[in-house]
Structures are given as C-alpha cells and as structure tokens.
Amino acid sequence: VSISYGTGEEGDGQTENQFISSLYQQASSEGMSVFVSSGDEGSAENDHRGANPTHGISISGWQSTAFDTSVGGTDFADTFLGTSKKYWNKKNTANYGSAKSYMPEMPWDDSCANVPLSTSKGFATPYGSAGYCNNGGPHSSVAGSGGPSNCATGTGTGGLINGTCAGWPKPSWQKLVGVPNDGVRDTPDVSLMAANGLWGHYYVFCDTSGGTCGSDPSTWPGAGGTSFASPIWAGFMALIVHAKGEPQGLINPTLYSIANEEYGKKGSKACNSSNKKTSKPNTTCIFYDVTLGDNDVNCLGTVNCYLPSGTAGVLSTSDSDYEPAYGTGKGYDFATGIGTVNVANLVNAWP
C-alpha cells in the first residue's frame, strides 16, 4: 500500500493521528506493508510548501506512525559535482535508457537554504545579508521532508509545536548509527530519487488524461516528489513478497536490521553514496548512505529560524546558531533516513 497524502501532526490533532496509526497497525497485522511519502515541504510541513515558512519544524502525521515506512526524497548529485559525463550516455539506448551506472545522491531540495545550491551560485552561506537567500535565491520550501515526531499527541496552537505537543515514542526497532537519542519516532525511514528538475533530474511519465502518449518519452511531461518515491518503494516490496511467497507486513524492523549489518557503529565508507567525485559505492551495498547536502528551507520569524541579518532566514534547530534542519551524516539522518537502495541486493538479502 502506498499513500501520498500528508498534513502536519499538529493540524491533524491527537484523535486523527491516533486513528491513522490504528489503521496502519491493523494493515500491518494483516500482512500489508504501508509506505507513505514523507512530504515535499522540507521539515516545515505546517507551512505546506509556503514560500517563507513561519511555523518552525514540523512533519506530516500521515507518515510519522510506528506502523508505516516513511519514504523521503533525493536528487542526483552529478550536476553539482560536475561529473555528469561520467554517469550519463550522450544518447538514449534503444529502450530509452540514459544512465551508465549508479550515481552520487544528495537530498532533494529546491530552496535557497540548500548548501549545495547556494555554494554552486558562489555564496559562502545561504543565510545572512550576504547569503543566497537574501540575494536572489529561490524562496521555496519544496524539498524532501523529514524530522522528529513532535506533536502526534497533545495540542499546539496556531500551527506551532507548543502547548502539550509530544511526539510518538521511538519504536524499539529504530536503532542505527545516526539515529538521535531523542525518544521519539524519527522520519523518514528510507529515500529514493524525487527530484523535480532543479539540477536537471526528474521523472518522465505518461499522462493519458489528455489522450495517448507518443512513443518517444522525450516528449512526455516530467515531475518529482516523494509521491513518486513512495509507490516505487511499494513496487520494490512487491518484488520481495513475490520472492518470499508471502506478505511481510511492517518491514521497518528488517530494514533497520539490514542497515545495522551494513553500516555498523561508524557508518560504511564502501556504501557512501557521496564519498568522492570519482568513486562509486561497492556493488554489494544494499543501502547507499547519502552524506552530501541537506533538506533545509528558508524561513521567516523567530521559530526554528536562524536569521542573523537580512530579511530571510533558514530553518534551524537553533534560533541563535546555524544548525540546519536538516543535514546529512553517517548512517541515519533526517534528510534521507537510512538512505537509498540497491533493489536487487535488498531482495536477495531479505531474510
């Protein structure tokens, strides 16, 4: 099952959040594996793609339960790294294939607050009066979502995470290098390519609502978002179910178990998606650990917004220091979760 709906935990309220969690729990008990898009709003779900978020850090209540697999979004990093020729064919193959191999990834993020984007435009920082967000950079909160559950229960006010807000407790299976000791459910669990064109990458798809599509995909429309990533992950799960001959239910315990074997206590250099410009992850990797970039977005106001000077700030876990919400790191992180996946290796490794 794949779900692409999403609204903030605080706005949904405790009753609806509990209802969603109970539905997913029932589904998993009946053998269903539930995948939910983490969202396309960075870590500012309560502003839902607003140009200048003002409500601080928040995530979708549709994907923050302990009974679903939250799917975040990445972008390919070849354009930023200047290595596109290494990974793409000059022309499509007879079957319209274009990629030569797996390529480096980074979190999907269209905002001026994104460090790779601001760096590529020649700015030392995305924030401050001399930063990219205050000098023509795109004010956008469109990015792969992720962050800690912070208002699944209790009540906030005015779209803010305050009052009696509290997150879902951390599931026993959510253990991995990089997982914070915050006591709450962290999202996403995994990620997949979700870019919508900023760096030249997006999904080509056939929209038949206006008629049939031509035979050449180069004439088809393109788009991105975690609403692509989530159903594709559900497709991966269908391969596993077919291989094992039986439904699997909630797969998160197995995902984190496999990731722990691969990453260990210090992360895995061999499976680092973003290790070097010229290197590729080992062909035996099941997960690719994304360690380049962030899913940070621009913001206004004084709630989780670092604004040292200028008029536009960047989403931060600190108002007084630059602590981007959120960066990448070894193993798990709020920008991409465990990371992305080698599907064939995952199917073959599934217990």
Model-derived features: where do they sit?
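Extracellular protease catalytic domains of secreted zymogens
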Residues: 1-351
